[in-house]
């Protein structure tokens, strides 16, 4: 099932909850524990990201760990183009609209486009 279909089917009549897990601040063992606990508590899926210094390897490992632990979608919450992983189920393609910096308004999105297209 595609992530969009999953979200649409889950949100009928209720709000959804997605847990943000930051591989820059959480060990692999803690990711397993947190994924299990939040899945049991009723989260609808997971977002991976947060820290600005994440490597692709850290993001890939986090996504793989969460997907092996649960059967819920893993959506990237990227802070930089270099942390776009093809192992995730989806990506939030965001734009920071309250910035005066062109880099944050469109630059990062332009830099991310080739990675998104590849995956």
Regions found by a protein language model. Give the residues of each.
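N-terminal amphipathic alpha-helix/helix-capping segment at the start of soluble metabolic enzymes
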Residues: 1-21, 25, 113-118
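Short, well-ordered coil/turn segments that N-cap beta-strands
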Residues: 13-17, 42-44, 70-73, 87-89
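Hydrophobic faces of well-ordered beta-strands that scaffold small-molecule active sites
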Residues: 17-22, 46-48, 74-76, 91-93
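Active-site beta-loop-alpha junctions enriched in small/polar residues
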Residues: 20-26, 51, 79-81, 96
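Short, acidic/polar
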Residues: 25-38, 79
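Glycine-rich, proline-tolerant flexible connector loops at the mouths of alpha/beta enzymes
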Residues: 47-61
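Alpha-helix-loop-beta-strand connector modules within alpha/beta enzyme cores
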Residues: 57-82, 111-119
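Conserved anion-binding
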Residues: 83-119
